[in-house]
Amino acid sequence: MSGLPRSVPDVLDPLGPGAPVLVAGGRVTGQAVAAVLTRFGATPTVCDDDPVMLRPHAERGLPTVSSSDAVQQITGYALVVASPGFSPAIPLLAAAAAAGVPIWGDVELAWRLDAAGCYGPPRSWLVVTGTNGKTTTTSMLHAMLIAGGRRAVLCGNIGSAVLDVLDEPAELLAVELSSFQLHWAPSLRPEAGAVLNIAEDHLDWHATMAEYTAAKARVLTGGVAVAGLDDSRAAALLDGSPAQVRVGFRLGEPAAGELGVRDAHLVDRAFSDDLTLLPVASIPVPGPVGVLDALAAAALARSVGVPAGAIADAVTSFRVGRHRAEVVAVADGITYVDDSKATNPHAARASVLAYPRVVWIAGGLLKGASLHAEVAAMASRLVGAVLIGRDRAAVAEALSRHAPDVPVVQVVAGEDTGMPATVEVPVACVLDVAKDDKAGETVGAAVMTAAVAAARRMAQPGDTVLLAPAGASFDQFTGYADRGEAFATAVRAVIR
């Protein structure tokens, strides 16, 4: 279809032919939103404070505006469509909210256009969220759907944006959504949705933990709600869900209406009386987290009728994504594992607990999260810690309180040298890579080389040197993938 219906369905209100829409953000998401709005006959204006981001839109003939000017003109717009990283606290969106102008995200726009039939018969959305495990679970779900012979597309916070896949001939969407995306998707009602777990994260974006949790809960408002029962916050969301069908999953033996583990096999007692799905040993993701991811994916797949055989085939052949518990090397009896995607304390804890003896490389940007409970839970697994990044002192303080006998090394980079370098840890030292930096090596690469070398000196045969940072990477790297690649490069250099 090339335009909005002349008689606009309620689901699209206030979006209609010629409707003036402010697109907040001119980057990749903004480009997709502006293109879709133009295609369907609305009148978008693109807002960004970077002239470089506005130039391509202006060259296409679209009006552009700065955020300060947009604030002054806000009542002239019927709708604002915001990029997912835009916090509700920024002046532009605060002004829109105060003026009563609706604010959608790109996911909300996609949901409404799909529900209105603008791309043909609406798809069934199977949505995954949670603090950790989203990407693995959604990828596993997509593999299950394909193995079951269903026409399914992987999208959202993984793969392609939802707006970019609605033209594809799919009946099902396997959608990973973040709390940012869900915050701006108030009308989303998926066929089935899963909350894997809830832990402190992104508190620099969400005003409170309650707001973060409420955003996650939006995936449980459709037909089938799925949540992890071993996580108290996720379980509470399931109890309060308005969904007609509520399904829990757990590591233990499942009750009726649940999926779980019995006799080392995954078992479905929610969509069948008692159906064995697959052996735990066939799950390629290490530790309890892999079992939980497989259970969540299986619950969503079973909710749309995927048979047990297809689920087992998909899991057995599944390959974990890069920088997610990825074994980089084994040398001298020591295993080196890249879990750079563990960007918050909850994920780091799950990663560490998958191994019996760990030299932990951690640190980065904690985003306002505390990690005392996590460090206490994994202290018995730690035989050493090497700390990097801006918030390394917070990690060191938690270690000093909950794992005081664990030796700790802090790696200091040039721009960090004015920061606190030591805390009261019994066996601690500081490595200043700025004093011995290799020519042409980036700060992040130098930090990681020093960190891996220090970890190697701590480790013994049978140990795992684990990069599970518990923080974001942007203080010293361009992203978690860059951090993971730096780790792999450093490992190869240290063990050769």
From Swiss-Prot:
Protein name: UDP-N-acetylmuramoylalanine--D-glutamate ligase
GO molecular function: ATP binding; UDP-N-acetylmuramoylalanine-D-glutamate ligase activity
Pathway: Cell wall biogenesis; peptidoglycan biosynthesis
Subcellular location: Cytoplasm
Matches recorded under SUPFAM superfamilies: MurCD N-terminal domain, MurD-like peptide ligases, catalytic domain, MurD-like peptide ligases, peptide-binding domain
Enzyme class: ligase
One Pfam family it belongs to: Mur_ligase_C
GO cellular component term, pick one: cytoplasm
GO biological process: one example: cell division
Main subcellular location: cytoplasm
Annotated EC: 6.3.2.9
Family under the similarity heading: Belongs to the MurCDEF family.
Catalysis: reaction(s): UDP-N-acetyl-alpha-D-muramoyl-L-alanine + D-glutamate + ATP = UDP-N-acetyl-alpha-D-muramoyl-L-alanyl-D-glutamate + ADP + phosphate + H(+)
Job description of the protein: Cell wall formation. Catalyzes the addition of glutamate to the nucleotide precursor UDP-N-acetylmuramoyl-L-alanine (UMA).
InterPro entries: Mur-like_cat_sf, Mur_ligase_C, Mur_ligase_C_dom_sf, Mur_ligase_cen, MurD
Residues that hold ATP according to the record: 130-136
Record keywords, A-Z: ATP-binding, Cell cycle, Cell division, Cell shape, Cell wall biogenesis/degradation, Cytoplasm, Ligase, Nucleotide-binding, Peptidoglycan synthesis
